From Swiss-Prot:
Enzyme class: lyase
UniProt-listed InterPro entries: Chorismate_synth, Chorismate_synth_AroC_sf, Chorismate_synthase_CS
Organism per entry: Streptococcus pneumoniae serotype 4 (strain ATCC BAA-334 / TIGR4)
Protein name from the UniProt record: Chorismate synthase
Cofactor note text: Reduced FMN (FMNH(2)).
The organism's taxonomic lineage, starting at the top: Bacteria, Bacillati, Bacillota, Bacilli, Lactobacillales
Gene: aroC
General function of this protein: This reaction introduces a second double bond into the aromatic ring system.
UniProt EC number: 4.2.3.5
Length: 388
């Protein structure tokens, strides 16, 4: 399974193409749109979310509510494009129109300046448009397809925010994936501890009044994972490594950890390793899950627990100093639309990329052209694992 996304933030549409999804997977536009709505939601979102009402359109690969095995093509229309017809025109336009929204003031923390140097642009809008987090719309769409596949294999996935700008959220112990998903969905800030809800919302309001932004930490949990996804035989086949790349590829994400993560560096080995248990009913399990569901780069059957660190959104309404690329004079950076935080939305993106990588691994290990054969192969593997 592989995929590509295309499109610009203010272009006419966003597109994704997925190849390798087995035939026979039940799939509707609403399966995708539900996750797109969640990506646009969350307390603290800004004006762009009021303009766009993202709806996916299938143009190939799905017929009568099921995948055909052919490449799946999905489009999402950018409604805001109508205000940018000249600026984002694919055809050449007059110089006076080109300069209308030309960007020469790179924003600190964005791809603007480095992209301009790399691709030799004199208008940094070219960098801004593709590097925008608007691209994650299609990664959420791809992830929604992957999640439908995982659900058919009795795997479940959820995300929630565990840190808001330095404010840690207390997470009740032993919550199931379903409970995490339910609690986070009921929260405007995607947390599982409802007692902290108003405190976090008040904090976001204050950050907005200050013209500033905050980052934080998002956790994704996956249950029902088969043993043995990934491999130790080569460095690039380790599943936790692939997941780490996927998470850090999300806009503004700067770090990733599994299970205890960096805390493991402060503990003794006896306090970190997960003791192995066995019972006739459950087969092999672990006493704890400090390693986040991985041993040797492979899934061990415990829930996958992965966290991503998101830096504060770099676009500030109190812009930082920058330098004009034409005059080299100091200048306050260009201000585009921004939000005080996008952590709840970022959680949806993280959930999507994790689901996508897991679907890729499933299809690599249990290669099948149709859903029926795939389900049979996974069920057979689960039986073997239990009786090993």
């Amino acid at each position: 399974m592989r995929y590509l996304t295309a499109g610009e933030s203010h272009g006419p549409r966003l597109t994704a193409i997925i190849e390798g999804i087995p035939a026979g997977l039940p799939l509707t536009a609403e399966d995708i749109n539900e996750d797109l709505r969640r990506r646009q939601g969350g307390y603290g979102r800004g004006g762009r979310m009021k303009i766009e009402n993202d709806q996916v359109v299938f143009t190939s690969g799905v017929r009568h509510g099921k995948t055909t095995g052919a490449p799946i093509t999905m489009d999402v229309i950018n409604k805001d494009h109508q205000k940018w017809l000249d600026i984002m025109s694919a055809e050449d336009i007059e110089d006076r129109l080109k300069s209308k929204r030309k960007i020469t003031h790179p924003r600190p923390g964005h791809a603007d300046l480095v992209g301009g140097i790399k691709y030799r642009f004199d208008d940094l809008r070219n960098s801004l448009e593709r590097s925008s987090a608007r691209e994650t719309t299609m990664r959420v769409a791809v992830g929604a397809v992957a999640k439908r596949l995982l659900a058919e294999l009795d795997m479940e996935i959820a995300n929630h925010v565990v840190v808001f700008g330095g404010k840690e959220i207390d997470v009740p112990e032993n919550l199931t994936v379903a409970e995490i998903k339910q609690r986070a969905a009921q929260s405007e800030v995607s947390i599982v501890n409802q007692e902290r809800e108003q405190e976090i919302k008040d904090y976001i309001d204050q950050i907005k009044r200050d013209g500033d932004t905050i980052g934080g930490v998002v956790e994704t949990v996956v249950g029902g994972v088969p043993v043995g996804l990934g491999s130790y035989v080569q460095w690039d086949r380790k599943l936790d490594a692939r997941l780490a790349q996927a998470v850090v590829s999300i806009n503004a994400f700067k770090g990733v950890e599994f299970g205890l993560g960096f805390e493991a560096g402060y503990r003794k080995g006896s306090q970190v390793m997960d003791e192995i248990l066995w019972s006739k009913e459950d087969g092999y399990t672990r006493r704890t899950n400090n390693l986040g569901g991985f041993e040797g780069g492979m899934t061990n059957g415990q829930p996958i627990v992965v966290r991503g660190v998101m830096k504060p959104i770099p676009t500030l309404y109190k812009p930082l100093m920058s330098v004009d690329i034409e005059t080299h004079e100091p200048y306050k950076a260009t201000v585009e639309r921004s939000d005080p935080t996008a952590l709840p939305a970022a959680g949806m993106v993280m959930e999507a990329v994790v689901a996508t990588v897991l679907a890729q691994e499933i299809l690599e290990k249990f290669s099948s052209d149709n859903l029926e054969e795939l389900k049979e192969a996974v069920a057979k593997h689960r039986d073997y694992t239990k009786n090993y």
